[in-house]
């Protein structure tokens, strides 16, 4: 039994570090890319998947790269936070393998690394996630003495796995108006199911006469199982003072579309 791969449209991610902390004699540009940066798989218990990734040295110096499998989660604002593999309840890092895990890349060189995923038998249906983290290892030149701080770059290639046929479920917990740093409508979405989903939909702003004065698409962002995410939408800066209603329509891929309304006043 095999896993099915869903290919998102994602550009390769490049980590470029300007080593401004180094003395002039030690400065060099470290830059590398990994593709793909998001892997989406689906399958049943006992399913397997094998594929490849490409790592390219975009800099002008050779780099040593180590690869590890790590857990991660998102803050309510969407910031990814990485942890040791096996920490999170929905971790799939124990199912993931990659080869090689330590290699050198000359300037301009690219390397194909192969990975595999094996879903354990008996695992519950639901969503699971992890990451292949590619990290540069500082090169130490024998006999060289420097007070420079070691600079490292890393790129996480995110892995999502859907086991079985779990149904996305969620709710809009809250909508607020925030005028502190630009006028924004903040919509808090809660994932109440066992599988991650991505946000689709929009925020529509109507005036007191019911006329639509602004419609803005929501960003295509993930909300992980057992978590909440606050989605900001910036209001038109030409919106005059007065009373308005924000109407949220959020498609999470389940059977129902989430909706919510929030009256607010622009001063």
Question: Could you say what each language-model-derived stretch is?
Answer:
Residues 59-61, 121, 138, 191-195, ...:
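Short, acidic/polar linear motifs in exposed loop/turn regions
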Residues 30-36, 60-115, 200-203, 207-213:
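Surface-exposed binding patches on compact interaction domains or structured appendages
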Residues 52-56, 186-192, 234:
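Short edge beta-strand/loop segments characteristic of extracellular beta-sandwich folds
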Residues 50-54, 64-67, 97-140:
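Ligand-binding face of N-terminal immunoglobulin V-set domains in extracellular IgSF glycoproteins
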Residues 128, 132, 242-248:
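A short tyrosine-centered beta-strand micro-motif
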């Amino acid at each position: 039994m095999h896993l099915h791969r869903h290919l998102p449209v994602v550009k390769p991610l490049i980590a470029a570090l300007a080593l401004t902390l180094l003395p002039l004699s030690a400065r060099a540009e470290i830059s590398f890319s990994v593709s793909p940066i998001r892997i989406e798989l689906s399958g049943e218990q006992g399913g397997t998947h094998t594929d490849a990734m490409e790592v390219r040295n975009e800099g002008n110096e050779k780099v040593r790269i180590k690869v590890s499998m790590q857990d991660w989660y998102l803050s309510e604002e969407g910031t990814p936070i990485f942890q040791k593999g096996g920490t999170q309840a929905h971790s799939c890092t124990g199912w993931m393998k990659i080869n090689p895990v330590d290699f050198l890349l000359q300037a301009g060189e690219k390397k194909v690394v192969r990975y595999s995923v094996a879903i354990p038998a008996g695992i519950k249906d639901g969503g699971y996630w992890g990451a292949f983290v590619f990290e540069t290892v500082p090169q130490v030149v024998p006999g060289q003495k420097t007070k420079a701080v070691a600079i490292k770059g890393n790129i996480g290639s995110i892995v999502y796995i859907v086991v079985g046929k779990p149904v996305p479920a969620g709710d809009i917990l809250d909508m607020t108006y925030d005028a502190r740093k630009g006028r924004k409508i903040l919509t808090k979405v809660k994932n109440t199911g066992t599988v991650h989903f991505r946000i689709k939909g929009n925020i529509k702003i109507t005036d007191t006469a019911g006329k639509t004065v602004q419609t803005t698409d929501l960003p295509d962002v993930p909300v992980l199982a057992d978590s909440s995410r606050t989605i900001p939408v910036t209001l038109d800066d030409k919106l005059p003072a007065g009373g308005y209603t924000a109407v949220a329509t959020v498609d999470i891929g389940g059977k129902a579309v989430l909706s919510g309304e929030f009256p607010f006043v622009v001063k």
